[in-house]
A protein has these predicted regions:
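Proline/serine/threonine-rich low-complexity linkers at boundaries of modular beta-sandwich domains
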Residues: 233-246
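Conserved aromatic anchor
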Residues: 262-271
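Bacterial N-terminal signal peptides
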Residues: 9-21
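Short, aromatic- and glycine-rich surface loops/edge beta-strands on solvent-exposed regions
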Residues: 201, 211-236, 340-355
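N-terminal secretory signal peptides that target proteins for export/translocation
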Residues: 1-7
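Hydrophilic extracytoplasmic domains
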Residues: 270-274, 283-451
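Sec/Tat signal peptide C-region and signal peptidase I cleavage site
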Residues: 22-26
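Solvent-exposed N-terminal domain segments of exported/luminal and surface proteins
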Residues: 28-209
Length: 451
């Protein structure tokens, strides 16, 4: 078997940047002839059973927390029917894989990826060139259609784990007095440049029109993979290990009412390098945001894959929580003003690793030319969402529902199911009970921005 070498590059944003940086060492380098990108994501809704889709495309949950962009970035549910769901906060299906192949030898030609039996998706996945699509909005970016209208209301930013609001908070952004560039920047906040492929007709993608098979609960990417196709080097075989495998679902539990200091706790997530929590709600025309970071930020740009270098830097700056962290308190009363019509929504990220595989490996001799035949990048993450406060306690019917909460409210991810001998509470589905009162950030942004 051809000898392969894992090249883990925490300081590089992508294989292309890594190769370019080697130029400073006077080594002649060329970009890989064939590049493969694999994004893997696990997503759940705390207290809800896992579902691949809901009737009618997911209804309210189909657009919940999907971001303000279009395309796959703007959909949080409804099935893994097209490329791009891994970067979004997809919860239906709960496990998503996006694959993009760029073959400079034969651009836009169909290919296939042989996969290990443990993926439980068949022997191989077809990689198909996409149809032309409008340019998608980047995470945190306010669409142009919303920027044409003068916004109203304010953004109130709170930050940090703790039972009480800290001195100097909240930071207030008055949208009615801000320039369009100011409020666009306010929504974007801290973010990283898009490091994904700019897919188009020259690429071949999965999922696609021919195949939308999703990863199952017991799927595993561990094992040998091989890309085949016209112009693809016969040597394009690589082995993925535990570090590149699907991350577990986040087992999140929340307690307390909006007028209280609400608690969040979770079990450690395997292969998680850092965590980040973000909650938001509405009070009149005001948008209230809180994050677990030690610095103020809207947090709209952090719900994406992060490079190892970015994770390390933001851990040092205390933007992200350390991987050994298992709990975080939300300050008392910051979401109390919304009342029954605005149940706060919490999002949580567990950032996994990023691996680069390049063949052949870089020569030890710095004077020798390096001409990689192919390169692979694999990124993994896990995320979950929860409705905060007692209004939604015990209202999740079906498998994995949380038991009735004691006074003060408690909310579990339901990953372990109801306790032995206790029936799951609630008789409603995903769109029953008070689900209609949950804050939908897409609609909330439309209201603030005058749409």
């Amino acid at each position: 078997m051809t000898s392969l070498r894992f090249v883990l590059t925490p300081a590089c944003l992508a294989v292309g940047l890594c190769i370019a940086s080697l130029g400073a060492q006077a080594q002649t380098t060329k970009a890989p002839k064939v590049q493969l990108w694999m994004d893997v994501s696990t997503g759940t809704m705390a207290g809800m059973p896992e579902m691949d889709s809901l009737p009618g495309g997911g209804g309210m949950l189909g657009g919940l927390m999907g971001g303000v962009g279009g395309g796959a970035q703007g959909r949080a549910g409804g099935g893994n029917t097209s490329y791009g769901h891994a970067r979004a906060m997809s919860i239906m299906p709960p496990r998503v894989i996006d694959i993009a192949l760029h073959n400079t030898l034969r651009p836009g030609v169909e290919a296939s990826q042989a996969i290990p039996p443990g993926m439980r998706m068949g022997e191989s996945l077809p990689l198909i060139p996409p149809r032309a699509q409008p340019t998608q909005t980047e995470p945190g970016e306010v669409p142009q259609e919303y920027q044409q209208h003068q916004p109203k209301g304010r953004i109130l930013l709170y930050w940090g784990c703790g039972a009480s609001v800290r001195a100097g908070q909240p930071r207030v952004i008055d949208l009615a007095r801000a320039k369009p560039t100011d409020y666009a920047q306010a929504f974007a906040g801290r973010a990283v440049p898009d490091r994904g492929p700019r897919v188009g007709p020259a690429y071949a993608l999965y999922p696609n029109e021919r195949n939308q098979v999703s990863l199952s609960r017991d799927s595993s990417l561990v094992g040998e993979h091989q890309v085949r196709g016209d112009g693809v080097p016969a040597s394009m075989k690589f082995t993925l290990g535990a570090a590149q495998d699907l991350m577990p679902a986040i087992d999140l539990r929340t307690t307390g009412k909006p007028q209280d200091s609400m608690g969040t706790s979770w079990q450690p997530v395997r292969n998680a390098r850092a965590y980040y929590l973000h909650a938001m709600s509405q009070s009149g025309d005001d948008l209230i945001m809180w994050s677990s970071a030690e610095t103020p930020d809207t947090g709209m740009g952090l719900f994406d894959y992060l490079s190892p270098a970015t994770i390390d830097r933001w851990l040092k700056e205390r933007v992200l929580l350390q991987p050994e962290t298992t709990q975080c308190a939300i300050p008392q009363g910051i979401f109390a003003g919304g009342g029954r019509d605005a149940t706060p929504m919490l999002r949580m990220m567990a950032y996994g690793g990023e691996s680069h595989i390049v063949h052949p490996p870089r020569p030890a001799d710095p004077k020798a030319a390096w001409e990689p035949e192919w390169a692979v990048r694999v990124r993994v993450k896990s995320h979950t969402m929860a409705m905060l406060g007692e209004e939604m306690q015990g209202r999740r019917g079906g498998m994995g529902a949380a038991p009735p909460a004691a006074s003060g409210g408690a909310y579990s991810s339901g990953m372990g199911g109801a306790p032995t001998g206790q029936q799951p509470a609630g008789d409603g589905g995903a769109e029953s009970g008070n689900a209609g009162n949950v804050v939908n950030p897409v609609n909330l942004l439309r209201g603030i921005l005058g749409r």
